[in-house]
Amino acid sequence: MDDDIAALVVDNGSGMCKAGFAGDDAPRAVFPSIVGRPRHQGVMVGMGQKDSYVGDEAQSKRGILTLKYPIEHGIVTNWDDMEKIWHHTFYNELRVAPEEHPVLLTEAPLNPKANREKMTQIMFETFNTPAMYVAIQAVLSLYASGRTTGIVMDSGDGVTHTVPIYEGYALPHAILRLDLAGRDLTDYLMKILTERGYSFTTTAEREIVRDIKEKLCYVALDFEQEMATAASSSSLEKSYELPDGQVITIGNERFRCPEALFQPSFLGMESCGIHETTFNSIMKCDVDIRKDLYANTVLSGGTTMYPGIADRMQKEITALAPSTMKIKIIAPPERKYSVWIGGSILASLSTFQEMWISKQEYDESGPSIVHRKCF
């Protein structure tokens, strides 16, 4: 499809917003889902001060701003700020007029009904889009992997969900949510690096720790054994150069940090780990479809990018499942953006074109139309 009429695909995550054009194989814009407002009026006199900043600009000016994340644990909690993020997406990042393009938005599994209505209302009334659609994030990830049945373990910055999907439909009664994701792991790494004598506290330093996490952390296949290896040799140590030129060395922190996904007790949480949550989701499904879920367990989201995570999931779920069960963990290399990619695929299918909610339908039925047309 041509850019001039291509649908826009916007995946709003707790940490990052991914946006682009349907039919593309990757999002054109990826920026932090943050809105910043000046802490003190008039502190930037003569700089053409704006009353708010979004994304990377808010991030770079964070010293003089109060930063807010309008999406918490995957769910929009601040609609005024969310509107600013969408405005920034259309006009500054994609440089398009939203009234000229259909818009596909994504939502968290189990998103409250009122929220989807509010999204619909803002798209039609504030941005005057000709058509829109709301799709569940995990379902799009499954489509991106070329499947319509499977269970998706989607873990991003703010929340982790396990979502069983059968023939393209998410099974709401079996979806489980775990409030443990990338942001918690970054915080945990800050904490364990502090125990090593390196101090990271400010939001600027948190970004450095996030980078260390993304570059050096991995999931151990056998945690106890890895701890023993780390204690007896320096083979697992890596060094990292901080922006000021100081070099720090990290050892067992590399795998202790993401281990919290499998042992939330590390963070003082009583929840089950991601392997057990996935298993529990499968067990909430009809016995006849479990086989299909075990054999199609798809990882999605930035927090599934750790090396070793798929092998560890395979090992842990094999230990929980019936002994004869075939278990397959699918970890596509592009899984950081698979929700967006699934949206790009869906919105460009010829069969999908009659699925859009049109402005006319919205005017006739109001925001509740979204429950009838998007599921």
Swiss-Prot record:
The modification N-acetylmethionine is found at M1. The modification Methionine (R)-sulfoxide is found at M44, M47. PROSITE patterns: ACTINS_1 (PS00406), ACTINS_2 (PS00432), ACTINS_ACT_LIKE (PS01132). The keyword Repeat does not apply. It is found in: Cytoplasm, Cytoskeleton; Nucleus. The modification N-acetylaspartate is found at D2. Its main location: cytoplasm. ISGylated. Oxidation of Met-44 and Met-47 by MICALs (MICAL1, MICAL2 or MICAL3) to form methionine sulfoxide promotes actin filament depolymerization. MICAL1 and MICAL2 produce the (R)-S-oxide form. The (R)-S-oxide form is reverted by MSRB1 and MSRB2, which promote actin repolymerization. The modification N6-methyllysine is found at K84. Disulfide bonds: none annotated. SMART domains: ACTIN (SM00268). One of its GO terms (molecular function) is hydrolase activity. CDD domains: ASKHA_NBD_actin (cd10224). Pfam families: Actin (PF00022). The modification Tele-methylhistidine is found at H73. SUPFAM superfamilies: Actin-like ATPase domain (SSF53067). Gene3D superfamilies: 3.30.420.40, Actin, Chain A, domain 4. Actin is a highly conserved protein that polymerizes to produce filaments that form cross-linked networks in the cytoplasm of cells. Actin exists in both monomeric (G-actin) and polymeric (F-actin) forms, both forms playing key functions, such as cell motility and contraction. In addition to their role in the cytoplasmic cytoskeleton, G- and F-actin also localize in the nucleus, and regulate gene transcription and motility and repair of damaged DNA. Polymerization of globular actin (G-actin) leads to a structural filament (F-actin) in the form of a two-stranded helix. Each actin can bind to 4 others. Identified in a IGF2BP1-dependent mRNP granule complex containing untranslated mRNAs. Component of the BAF complex, which includes at least actin (ACTB), ARID1A, ARID1B/BAF250, SMARCA2, SMARCA4/BRG1, ACTL6A/BAF53, ACTL6B/BAF53B, SMARCE1/BAF57 SMARCC1/BAF155, SMARCC2/BAF170, SMARCB1/SNF5/INI1, and one or more of SMARCD1/BAF60A, SMARCD2/BAF60B, or SMARCD3/BAF60C. In muscle cells, the BAF complex also contains DPF3. Belongs to the actin family. This is Actin, cytoplasmic 1. It comes from Cricetulus griseus. The lineage of its organism: Eukaryota, Metazoa, Chordata, Craniata, Vertebrata.
